[in-house]
Amino acid sequence: MGNNLRRAAHRRLGLALVCLGVWRCAAEPAPRTGARDAALSYLLSRLSPFQSEGIYYELGEDRIRLSASPEGARFIPSFELPDDAPLYPVLTEYKRVFVYDAAVEVCALVLAGKHSEAKQLLRTIEAMQLLDGGLGFSFNASGDTFYNHSYLRSGTVAWAGYAAVLYGHETGETDFRAFAGRIAEWLERQQVPGDRLLDPRAGLIMGGHGQWAEDYSELTKGKRTWAGTEHAIDAYFFLRDYARSQQAPSMRSRYAAAADRVKRALLEQMWTEPAPGLGRFVQGVDRQSLNLGKALDCCGGWGALFLLAVGEREKAAATLAYTAETFATTFRPAEADEGVSVTGYRPYAGHNEGIDWDRYPDVVWSEGSLGVALSYLRLGRRDKFESIVDNMLKLCTVPGDPRSGVRYSRYRQDLAAGPKAPVDTATVIKDLTQAPSACCTAWLLLVLESAEEGNFGKFWGPDQ
């Protein structure tokens, strides 16, 4: 999320795209165990060997050298688009992988007990780690060596570290201890020092590095000094659990203190209550002022999960109430052959990301909707959890069947009316694709596995 919608670039097209997660829904609700197995089948069927000499380009003649891919490294392509789609050369032809997607896939596979496959994905993520400990946003995994290594987002880096820590906790292995340690040091350097009376960002995590031009034709390098709520939440869970994994008392206290600073900054600086019984986190802050944008991941998704984890149950209920009032929506197809109606949540409200989202009230964003579902489950509202899950199953390419992949989003302004239908790019909202997404399918699996008794609280669980 974060710059919520994930950006990608390609040397020939200079385009970018968003990727985020999703989960399940069914025209007629399928047995949830069957949906879980089907989502797992989708991911496992797309695992491919990752083979790279470790030399990558980004723009022009620049090159960086990283580690060659280790034995056993594998990847899952983030998107499946037909070869006549405008974004096919960017997302599908060279098997584009978004690092965030891969991290979500690792978490889902770990909870599903597929530790060997999770390790194979982590091997690939580890091979892409930069010398300073960070991770670029996305890379081509087959037939081309593009790596968006100057565009980093702290939330993505934190997710990769969290996936490694979760894997280590569940397996007892230490293979990725050094990898996670370098991420911890990188995030520590992004944490804003000082007192919030002097700097409203104090304690939060700066956004990362790099910024693409609006048309993705130019990349401005350098640190992004704004701090976003979503990145802070991602970093909190990683820093907290990384601290728990440390045996040395000095390391435990060092990173526990960093996590605590993030937690206090979020609760004291970013929380607002616009009306009685309603609450939310603002979207971010720079040196001068708060960004009051309305983003789903700062409210009923990531925000509510964070509040529940830190024991702020009343605030979690308030932000879910705000989410229902502000982001709930329904996609209704214009034609019968465009699928079925789906109720879920839109990514933004009001003006955000250069768009008036209130002009597009029917956008259903699957990843964010899944986060809301998991929040309701942990609040004890299994009825709401099941209702959202059943709706998300309708977002499968074949409604109700996760083996066909879960769409990234759904709305009337279709990216494509069908698998081989003509595409009118003018109808695409921002960078939201309606193609099936590996990350979205992984989110479905992650949420369903999190509902299992043996897994409850393993992912982004409560403070202890």
Predicted regions and their residues:
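Bacterial N-terminal signal peptides that target proteins for export
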Residues: 2-13
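Extended ligand-binding clefts on enzyme/binding-domain cores
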Residues: 30-87, 92, 96-100, 127-130, ...
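Non-membrane alpha-helical segments in proteins
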Residues: 100-112, 120-124, 159-163
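Bacterial N-terminal signal peptides
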Residues: 12-21
